[in-house]
Amino acid sequence: MMILPRTGFGRGADSVVLVLLWVLGSVLAKDTAFVEVVLFESSPNGDYTTYTTGLQGRFSRAGATISAEGEIVQMHPLGLCNNNDEEDLYEYGWVGVVKLEQPELDPSCLTVLGKAKRAVQRGATAVIFDVSENPDAIDQLNQVSEDPLKRPVVYVKGADAVKLMNIVNKQKVARARIQHRPPRVRPTEYFDMGIFLAFFVVVSLVCLILLIKIKLKQRRSQSSMNRMAIQALEKMETCKFKAKFKGQREASCGASDSVSSSSTSDCAICLEKYIDGEELRVIPCAHRFHKKCVDPWLLQHHTCPHCRHNIIDQKKGNPGAVCLDPGNPVHGRQQRVVLPVHYPGRVHRAGQVTAYPTRTSMDPHGNPITVLTVDQHPEQGLYPSQSSFIRGYPALHLDHTLNPHHCGLEHRGPAYPQTHTFKRPKFHGRNFSRAACFSQYETMYQHYYFQGLTFPQPEGQPSNGLHKGHNRPFQPGLLYPTVVHMAPASSSRLGDSGSTSGLSCYHGHRSVCSGYLADCPGSDSSSSSGQCHCSSSDSMLDCTEVSNQGVYGSCSTFRSSLSSDYDPYVYRSKSPCRGSAGEAGAVFSAAPPADDTSAPVSGMIDCLQPPGGACYSSGDQLSNCSLEPNCSNHSSVETRELTSTTSAGPLEGNVAERSHNSVKPCGEQGVACNCCFEVPKLNLERKGKEGEDRGHCRWATEAQAVASSQNFYSVSTEQLPSPDHVSYDGLPCCFYTEMTVHRGGANHYAEDCSVNIQYAQTDSDGCMGQGCCELAQRIPIIPEDTDCELGLGPEPQTSLLSSRLTTEREERTSSEDTCDLFFTSGQCRGQVYQQPQDEEARALFSSKCNAVSETQGSSTSSFDGSGL
C-alpha cells in the first residue's frame, strides 16, 4: 500500500470543514432550547415538595427564540383540529405539550404549523412538540414562513421526549421554564452560605487550639503542683508517737517545741487514737495526723485538712508564716510579740506602729499563742507632725534569754506591707502652754499594753523556788494575767521648752484602765477574791463577754449603765505616781490604811512628793501589779468600791504658788522615794529645811540621770525585794526592767528596749514588805494618768467633778486651804469604807501610818487638792 503525501489542497479542506462545524455548532447552540420542568408534590399534611428536571429541545423557525414559562397543559392533536374558536378556550400563561402521531394515523385536518398557531391563539405562551414518532414534522416547522409566531415553538425527541411525556402523564401539577441559553448559576447565590461555613470553621479551629493550649497548661501546672507537693511532703517533718507514763499522749519528734495538733491523742481524719510507734505527719501549720491518712489528702488538695494551710505556699516562702527576728540588727525595727489565743489582748500604740498577726500555734507547754509583728518605723512622710506629748515611745521586744524562741520558722526580713492604720489627730504643736486635753479615744490610741503574756521561762535555767500562795505552786509556762506598758520618753514631756505641764486632764473624766482575765466568769453582781473566781447570782459567763473595755483594754471615762457597772479586773497599783516636769511638778499617790481607825474624809487624796528638783521621765511604775475586779452592781449615783479609780487633772498654777504651798504629811514615816520605794524615817530635826532632798537616795540619783539621758524610765528589780524572801498575797504579780539602748533619732523610736519580766505569786499571809502585791494597788497604765486613790465619801460620784472645780477656786483664793486637804492614806480611807479590807489594806511601804507627822519644809511642788 502506498501512502501519498498530502498536498496543500487537502489542508485547506480540513480548515473549511472545521469552520463549518464551528458555525453549525454555534447555530445549533443558538437554536437549543433548555426546558426546565418543576414538579410540585404535595404531602398529606399539606406541604409541597419541588423537583426540577432539565430537558433539551430545539427552537423551530416557526416561532421566536425567547424565554417562556407557564403551567404544562397536555393537548391532543385532534383537539387542535376544531375550528370553533368558542370551544376549548384556555387562560393565558400556559405551555402546551403536543405528542404527534405517526403520519398514517395523524389526521390531516391541520398541519403541524397550523396546530402551533391554534395553540398560541388559545393563550399558550409556548408550544412543545414530541416528534419522536413523526420526524417529518421537524422539516415542516423549520420552513421559512412569511409570518412567524411571536411565541417560541420547541420540539423534543428521544430520551428527553420520554421524560417529558412521563411527567405530563403522571403529574397533575408541573411547571415548565424555557430558556434559550443554559441557566447560569449566580455567583452570589451560595456566597453567604460559604462565608458562614468559612467563619464557623475558623472559629472552631481557634477554639480547639485554645482548648488544647489550656489543657496542656493545666496539665503542666498540675504536674508541677504535684511535684512541688511531693517535694514539700518529703521535706515535711514526721515523728513517732510516744505515750507518756500517765496516759497523756504527746508526739516525740525532733522539733516538738514548734509542733502542735488539733487533738493531743487522736487523729482528726480517721478519729482513731494514736498508738505508740505510729508515724505522724507534722504539717508546717503545727497540726499532726496519721501519715497514711494525711499524705493522700496533701498530695491531692495541698492544704491542711484542719486549717486549710497551703503547703505549697509554705514551700514557696509565704510571708504570712515567717517570724521576724528582732535580734537581727538589720531588722531591729520589727518586734515579735507572743500573745495567747485565749487571751486576745489588743495592741494600742501611739504614733506610727502597726501590728501584724503572723501565725498561731502552740508553745511547748500546750498553750495556744499568737505571734504578732509590730512595725515601728513606717514612712514618716505619710503622717503629720506629732505632738511632743505622744512622741518618743520606746521600742519593746521580749528578751530571748527569758523568752526562748520556739517558732521553728524561717527567719528573714520583714515581708509585710507597711500599712498605716492610724493617722494622728489635729495635734501638731511642739509646746503646750497648758496641759493638753485628750478624749478617752485618744487615750486608747496613744497607749498600748500587752495582756496575757506567757511566762517567759529562761532557757537552760531551772525554775527557782516555787512561790506558794494558797497552797498552790507557781508553775512556769502557765498563763498569768500581766501587763507590759511602754511609757513615752521624758523628752516628749520635759524636753520641750514652754511646756508647763505634760499631764492631760482627759476632760476631767474619771479614768478606768481596764484589763481582763479571760478564764474567769463574772457578771453584774459578781465579786472577786485572790483566786480570781467570780461568783454571780445571775449567770456564769466569761468575763470577756461582759465588757468590751475589759477585752480590749482601754482608758474609759466614768461609766454608768442601766443595769451594770461591771468592769472586770481593773489593773491597780499603789506605787508612787510621777511628776509632770522638772519644775517640781506635783504628783499624787494612793496607799491603803493600816487600820480602820482614821476619820472619814470626803474628797481628800494622799500626796507623795517626788524628789525636789529631780527631772525624771514619765514611765510605768510597775513595781507591783495585780488584778482586782470592779464588780459594783450599783447605779452611777452610788458610792463606788475601791476598784474605782479617778484621774487627776492637769495641775495648774504658777511656780510661785507651788513654791509657797506646803503639804501636811501624815504618819511617822517620811515621804517615800520614787525610785527605790524606800520610806526614810522622818527626821524631826530637819523640820525647817527645804524639802528638795527629801526621799532621795544614791540609786535614785543615778537611775534618774541615766533615764533622763536615755529618755526612758527605768525600774530595776535589784532594789525591789526578792521574791524568794518576801511573801505575797493575792494574784500573781510581775516585775520588769527596761534596758535602754541608743535611740536612732529625735523623731524615731528606740531600736530595742529589752523588758525582763519576773513573776511572783503572793501568799495569803502578811503582805507588809516592800514591793508587796495587793489587790487595791493601781498601776498607772497611762503615763499621763497621774491620779491617785481618792478617799471617797458617801456622796455620789457625780459630784466629784464639781467638788474639784470648787476646790480649784478655793486654791486660787487661798493657798493655805490647799494644805488642809492633803492627808496620808490612813486618814483618807480609814472610815470611808466600813467593811473589812484585810487584803486591800496593806500599803506598798512596810511601815504603818499611825500618826500625823510634823509639817515638812517648803515643798517643791503644790497640789490641786480637789482631785476629781
UniProtKB/Swiss-Prot annotation:
Belongs to the ZNRF3 family. The chain crosses the membrane at residues 194-214. Residues 1-29 form the signal peptide. It catalyses: S-ubiquitinyl-[E2 ubiquitin-conjugating enzyme]-L-cysteine + [acceptor protein]-L-lysine = [E2 ubiquitin-conjugating enzyme]-L-cysteine + N(6)-ubiquitinyl-[acceptor protein]-L-lysine. PROSITE patterns: ZF_RING_2. GO terms for biological process: negative regulation of canonical Wnt signaling pathway; negative regulation of non-canonical Wnt signaling pathway; protein ubiquitination; stem cell proliferation; ubiquitin-dependent protein catabolic process; Wnt receptor catabolic process; Wnt signaling pathway. A zinc finger (RING-type) spans 267-308. The gene is znrf3. This is E3 ubiquitin-protein ligase znrf3. GO terms for cellular component: plasma membrane. Residues 30-193 are extracellular. It comes from the Eukaryota. Gene3D superfamilies: 3.50.30.30, Zinc/RING finger domain, C3HC4 (zinc finger). Its EC number is 2.3.2.27. Residues 215-868 are cytoplasmic. Pathway: Protein modification; protein ubiquitination. It is found in: Cell membrane.
